[in-house]
Curated annotation (Swiss-Prot):
Annotated gene: gpsA
Disulfide bond entries: none
Enzymatic reactions: sn-glycerol 3-phosphate + NAD(+) = dihydroxyacetone phosphate + NADH + H(+); sn-glycerol 3-phosphate + NADP(+) = dihydroxyacetone phosphate + NADPH + H(+)
Name of this chain's protein: Glycerol-3-phosphate dehydrogenase [NAD(P)+]
EC annotation from Swiss-Prot or TrEMBL: 1.1.1.94
Pathway(s) where this gene product acts: Membrane lipid metabolism; glycerophospholipid metabolism
Family: Belongs to the NAD-dependent glycerol-3-phosphate dehydrogenase family.
Entry-linked SUPFAM superfamilies: 6-phosphogluconate dehydrogenase C-terminal domain-like, NAD(P)-binding Rossmann-fold domains
Amino acid sequence: MKNSADITVLGAGSYGTALAISLASNGHKTLLWGHDPVHMQTLAQDKCNQAFLPGIAFPDCLQIEADLAKALAASNNVLVVVPSHVFGTVLEQAKPLLRSDARIVWATKGLEPETGRLLQDVARDVLGEQYPLAVLSGPTFAKELAMGLPTAISVAGTCPTFTNDLVELLHSPKRLRVYANDDFTGLQLGGAVKNVIAIGAGMSDGIGFGANARTALITRGLVELTRLGEALGANAATFMGMAGLGDLVLTCTDNQSRNRRFGLALGKGCDVMTAQAEIGQVVEGYRNTKEVFTLAKRLGVEMPITEQIYQVLYQGKSPVDAAKELLSREKKSETPAQ
């Protein structure tokens, strides 16, 4: 079946829209679908996503499509960019409408709610083994990507041909550098864990602990990510790349990050509900914390920072008490014997 579009993007929030803008700016005919018909009608009329990316005009190659069946019929390349807690639901909706030659990539960062499973497992449960799968991950703020500011990301998947095609589709010499990676598991995990650590970094700064504490937290957060990744069979080197260290540093240090701002509010004394309300958009790290904590417990992986953040978010511990507990842990070597 011939494509009438080069790629269809499912998810018209800030990041989905930004990726669609980037693709269309590359000259690729791009369809953008969202679940809210009223929102989609507004996007089509305004030629801009005023709700999430105000003032950034849509390229001519970007088309708004409110009908999911039409959106999925237009292209065999499908990019899913929805919150992790509805990832499986969106795939369920899409499944009967997918083309037989469909190829699925997602930029969703997170794990399955309650179980802590990787999204590749969710996708396989819903879609079976029929379709090539891939994940896009790395240090990307939606606004900067949509504005065309230089950005770099990584992509990995189950099919090398699909991965290479995505590199060609996404890469732009002027705005977006894309690295191929063969660690499908590692790329997915980095996007979830960095959200958790970013909340911790925000809490630390909100309390007023300073740059030393923030840097220590980021560094030890990277250790926790690597431990968990290795337990799942990921390549430790992945976490020194875009989807690991890159995304971790970005999210922990810049206030464009909702997760960091959420942590800042908590550190300054807000309760969880008030802090979430202040952000006004989905704070993926809130759910991710429970998911990552659940996964770590199931695998027997020590993640003390994640555990303390979990206790703040779900058990009512104060950020100050969480910090005290981390600082009073038993002394140990930074390079334990293997």
